[in-house]
């Protein structure tokens, strides 16, 4: 600034700086500075200085008054805490005076200064305050006190996208919409010159209409002129961080806005797949996958992801040099994934979102998680002994969006001369402010009405769909009714036929009964004569045969009668079922008609609500256009209803039972149409009246503004004339006043333009009202025509009623006929039962008479019974032998039970021995008897011991035999396979050799022909016949070649099939072998347990020597451990949690059972060889940062060779190839660069190795998991000890296990550490069948070596 400028211009520039909200010395900033000074100086130690004490005594009271007048936290009511982070929390608040709802973010000043290198609160404030973008959360106010920074933002009631993804399976259509909105939001931030650096679903919030806005700009950073950023700290969330940001840790990080597009790719993948693409349980695992993204990025096979989506994800998740979006946002917008018919990039904000949140009130927090109260003590600034300036970094943070700044310096100087001008200006400003507020409120109302209109349209569409579905159901029901009536007629016809058959059968039965009665008479006569002669016996036999034949006939007839009865009952049941179906269908039809009428009523009510909402929006011309479209749609619906009525009436003629309901529908439709027309007329009249009122109100406002303007202009002109004559020095001031007037003129012109726009809208609305009136007249004419048609249809309905009555009478007659038939059937059944009783009596008499004739047969029967008894005895003997075999097979189970009983006996004996030692002084004789008893029990136990040892030896032999069989089978299989392969090779080589010989022969023949002299001499004189012969020969050769090729291809296909079959057999045999090995392992552990018990028994029962307790404990084998542990379910703790398994650790194996039943059946799900164990250790927070903090002390890790694993379900997993993780070799270590955001210490210098936001560059060995600072290697310091692990990491696997408590974890770790072999397991052959179930875990992270209680490293 030049010193030649006048004081007025200087003061004017100072005034502009004070009024500018972006200036560093505006009024709020100066007030913040005074407030901060008072806060920082008001301490007893500092007030000893006189200058400070004088300053405080001068300004402290005024600053306290200013604090009371400025915005503070007490101005808001806290509704609920909706979020909590590292620096503070987010509260849902309501302003006490305005009752408006906001989201207020609290940031702790102590935490900000403590982590000043990672706190970007200025960027967050500036972006939200000055963005003016619909894609960024708006900041209304920012203020502070001595402990917190406060940011009052707009409340987003839809929650974040994490909540949406947890509640819905996001389809690709939704993913396209939300990804497009994220792209536009990031473009808005990039256009302001910032990079977000922490794009994730947690920072994407949904407003009340379901649209997305970005939030949490605490990691944003300002770009330089080249659009790049320099940063040496890795900022962001591990799953979403880009490779170039990871590389910036500890080095010269230089990257641009493309790091945000990487996070967008991760977000899109997570929406479509359900998990992040580089998921791992440990931080090192995620970071190594991100750095090796070319090989680790894969898509699951079970997800239907389009090619365009995969292409977009791969274009985002690639190197920054070729990443999509590096050259601008337009190349992202042009991608094929975003092509659709629903929305365009320009109208994306106006389209209806896929999910619109259902809100009960303005403070609805159903889309946010309930948070527990923060009971931790808050850290505050300590009382200083010298000046620290803790409040100075936050000077200028205060911001008010609607702040009216101080008037200009010129205006303050002219107060004495222009009081009237000031009052006029204030009045004009108030009126303009009121008009702006009205405009803002009307725009908000417009937006709300548009949203309501959209929701009501959606509801209308749903209702129309439901009406169509109900109409289709009604048609289906009517067709079903007609089919049922046809079936009913057919059944009645069948019933008549069956009745005729029943009558015929009854006649036959009567004739047969008469014949039976005659036969009975003849039998009685023959019985009397049988006592006198043998001839009568022969006749008796003949009569018996005849009787039997008659009985057979009777049985057949009775069977036929029973069948007829069954068929009759079935027919009656079917008739009753059909009648019930008919009734149900009629009831359903009635219910459907009622539901249709209710739906129509709801439809008209919704229309009334719609029109009421449109009536409130009379000032908007767009909604009147919607009204016109709705009226035309209503006309089309009336036409559609008319066609429906005609169709329904045509169907009513066929379906006679639905006539009454159709009349009700017609009446309802007439009433609804009349009501609809009246309501439309009333609404139109109300809209016209409201337009007149608004027009009058606007004209009054316009006149008042014009009058105020004219008065102000006259007075200003007078004052200007007076001041020109009186003061020439005040020209600059007059110029300023003229500028203000011109500004007011511009405002007035804008308001006039708005008024003209409103009047034009009003005229348009009046024209549209006229058009609506014409359309109403047309609809009234159509209504008269419809009434006439309805009358004709009512006449036809009366005719159909008469026909329905006739049909009902016919149905009643059929029902009466049915009842008569049922009565006749009941009588026939009674007669049949009486005949059956008579037949039984006759059969009893026959049996009594036949008793004498069957005496001679009894001897034969006795002989047969004797033979049968012998056979039974033989069968019993066979069964006894089989039971003996079964007992032999169950000797193992009996041996186990015996061992348990012998343990109990041993305990009893020990108790008896203890009592005997006490009573030995009193009764020596008793002692001797008890010793003899004990000797007997010992001998008995020794016998059982010998039996058990024999059984164990037998089992061992069987086990060895099984192993030998398995080996021989494997060797035979390998030999067979090698022989087949050799045979195939030999056959192929023969074919190749034959083809080669044929080829050489043909070439030789051609050479001979070419080298012949005759051929050379007569080359020019060659005849056409020779050429034809050669062509024939060539064709023959080609045919032979083709035949040979076909044969060869057939042979290849055949051998390929055989190979596939052999491979399938190999897989089956491998699975069977795995199962057998697992069962053998479980059996071996059981045998081992039995041996331990036997040893205990043998030691306890040795009476001769009684060793001390210490000696016995020393001689016992190491006890095994078993119990419940949890294993990661499907390898993903975050998504699927833990799975409980029963684990048994024996001397050689670790067995995993799904439950105790599997343990009893000896079928483990997984077996690990203890010989293949590398390492056992407790985990740290960095290893399993996805697990709960309470679970981390209970988790431990097992590291083992992958050939030592045997699983029940073998899953062939693809081995990842080409993975090249960057690691540094140093003293046998393989160091991987990493970062620790959780507590960890360097094992070389014992200094902290972690930080929440800016961790130092670190290294971790992927073998022994030693952690150290990267500087130790860079500076070549000899502080790191050599690596103690010598196994190959690529051949190793790890497993996480969760114990029930921390003590259990320690117990398992100490026990397994003792089991680790001193010599590490050797490498394995990768072609072995067991490697089918292994998976590549080269990038798995394992942490530091845990020290054992004895001091040795585990």
UniProtKB/Swiss-Prot annotation:
ATP binds at residues 82-90, 105. Residues 422-692, 1011-1102 form a coiled coil. SUPFAM superfamilies: Cysteine-rich domain, G protein-binding domain, Myosin rod fragments, PH domain-like, Protein kinase-like (PK-like). The keyword Metal-binding applies. Its cofactor is Mg(2+). GO terms for molecular function: ATP binding; protein serine kinase activity; protein serine/threonine kinase activity; Rho-dependent protein serine/threonine kinase activity; small GTPase binding; zinc ion binding. GO terms for cellular component: bleb; centriole; cytoplasmic stress granule; cytoskeleton; Golgi membrane; lamellipodium; plasma membrane; ruffle. Residues 1118-1317 form the PH domain. Gene3D superfamilies: 1.20.5.340, 3.30.60.20, Phosphorylase Kinase, domain 1, Pleckstrin-homology domain (PH domain)/Phosphotyrosine-binding domain (PTB), Single helix bin, Transferase(Phosphotransferase) domain 1. The modification N-acetylserine is found at residue 2. Residues 479-556 form the REM-1 domain. Pfam families: PH_MRCK, Pkinase, Rho_Binding. Residues 949-1015 form the RhoBD domain. One of its GO terms (biological process) is mRNA destabilization. Keywords: Acetylation, Apoptosis, ATP-binding, Cell membrane, Cell projection, Coiled coil, Cytoplasm, Cytoskeleton, Golgi apparatus, Kinase, Magnesium, Membrane, Metal-binding, Nucleotide-binding, Phosphoprotein, Serine/threonine-protein kinase, Transferase, Zinc, Zinc-finger. A zinc finger (Phorbol-ester/DAG-type) spans 1228-1283. Disruption phenotype: Mice exhibit both EOB (eyes open at birth) and omphalocele phenotypes as a result of disorganization of actomyosin cables in the eyelid epithelium and defective actin assembly in the umbilical ring. The modification Phosphoserine is found at residues 1105, 1108, 1328. Residues 76-338 form the Protein kinase domain. Highly expressed in brain, heart, lung, liver, stomach, spleen, kidney, testis, muscle, embryo and placenta. Residues 1333-1354 are annotated as: Disordered. Residues 368-727 are annotated as: Interaction with FHOD1. The active site is at residue 198. Belongs to the protein kinase superfamily. AGC Ser/Thr protein kinase family. This is Rho-associated protein kinase 1.
